[in-house]
Amino acid sequence: MVMDAGKKREAGALLPEEAFETGAPEGTLGAEEELWLADPETLKLAGGAQKILAAEPAEHFSGELIDCEVEANTGVHREAAGVARDLLARRRTLLEHAGRLGRVLGTSGTHPLGDWREQEIIDKPHYQYLKRKLGWLIRRNNTFSLHVHYAVQGKEKVIYLFDRIREYVPHFLAVSVNSPFWQGEFTDTRSARALVFSRSLPHAGMPEAFGSWSAYAGYLDFVGRPGVIRRLGEIWWDIRPHPRLSTLEIRAFDAQTDPARSEALISLAAATCDMLCAEYESGELRPARPVREIEDNKWSAQRHGLDGLFVDHETHEPVPARWAVERLAELAASSSRRDLSSLERLLEEPTESERQLLVWRETGSVKEVARDIARRTRAAIPAT
């Protein structure tokens, strides 16, 4: 996501002084989408990202750990539709490069056949540093996500949004699941990506609430001053403030094969943030849920997607995950002018994971699952 980034740092910390005081207008959006390259015959992951990056503007594409993965970045837009148009344009560019490189392009939360032991870490100082620091842990993190950025003005406001939106991470994951396979095997889950990612890396998964900007800044000082982390990009939580961009970054979504689904998810994330901004501005603040009250719902989302059960935070009764997402959309729509009609259609369809499993059950082949993802990724890009 391209936004103005500050240079100055708070003393002894990782934070730009002007974090959440400058930047894009509040409520504007951007996104990052991670895609994979594969061999057209074997459908296994195959390199080429570094060649693409050398030929394209840095504000449009960036490297993401391995040479078979490219991150597409959007500009700043007021509506999800503008973000989605950027993502589709980036996909078209990547598809052209993939053809020249003898690759196919696809995106899903994990690659169904991907073997992390065969992947090359890109020649970028940050990722070579992580390879030395984390070794096996970082090498096995072959996952692909959709990240949504929501611009926020105000340090205390962004922490309030961060604390409160955590309880909706399971909702975001359940509706976006797109990774039932890992290393060529069915995992009996609907989001292997979420499990692999949160269990592989330090400072990943569901974060604790902070309650105030000073508590958040104090934590960054705690891990930054002694060099536990060298940059904010080493914090991989499901939700995180992004001080350099002055955004709240929602990182809970599996990457979507169908770009129309990506647009619906961006709209849901934005409307949820709108709702929490209105809550903050009304002065009727609500307490943040502790991690222990969120994790069970997240586990259900990982395991079952929209077909699982959540514990309702208000009644403590089990409710269908699909109903919980519908309820979130209703609540968000009451405080937001954003169009959530595409989400309504999405909730009536099988999840991306169910689409993968349908192909697998029909063909008995994980390779055919990967082929179908690449086919659908290509088919969703209109000819120019």
Curated annotation (Swiss-Prot):
Name of the top EC class for this enzyme: ligase
The UniProt record lists the keyword Calcium: no
Any one GO biological process: modified amino acid biosynthetic process
Single GO molecular function: ATP binding
Entry similarity comment: Belongs to the glutamate--cysteine ligase type 2 family. YbdK subfamily.
Documented EC number(s): 6.3.2.2
Keyword match Ligase: yes
Catalytic activity: L-cysteine + L-glutamate + ATP = gamma-L-glutamyl-L-cysteine + ADP + phosphate + H(+)
Pfam families referenced in this protein's UniProt entry, alphabetically: GCS2 (PF04107)
Protein's recorded name: Putative glutamate--cysteine ligase 2-2
Functional summary from the UniProt entry: ATP-dependent carboxylate-amine ligase which exhibits weak glutamate--cysteine ligase activity.
